[in-house]
Amino acid sequence: MIKNISNLGDAALYCDFGTEVNKDINSKVIKLFETIREKNIEGINNLTPSYNKLIVSFDLKITNFKKIKEIVENIQIKETQKLNNKKLEIPVCCDSSFSLDIERLEKKLNLDREQILEVFFNKEFFCYMTGFIAG
């Protein structure tokens, strides 16, 4: 599951699940994230999941890297644990003033506009994260 656990500065550790970005690895990251969060482990003050990593930040006045690493290494995650996924429908406007690359796609794919939109709208997309990044 976790390929490597290393320190990230003085008060955080870095759980590395590998370099690939896919739903399987991401679900392992999220399951570990949720398990640690639910356990409410003393000293852990922040959890930051990404596509294939989890950062566990902790309070050095309460705990240390060695203790948190041992806890993380020994956490049991149920493979059958269900993730709290939601299916969202996001409205999309495909007016020609917004679909600036449609002509290029028509030529490249040898499809007309309607065929391209049909392919696009008949596909489900997996969203790894939502939110905003500062900057």
Predicted region positions:
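Conserved "landmark" site that anchors the functional core of diverse proteins
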Residues: M1-G135
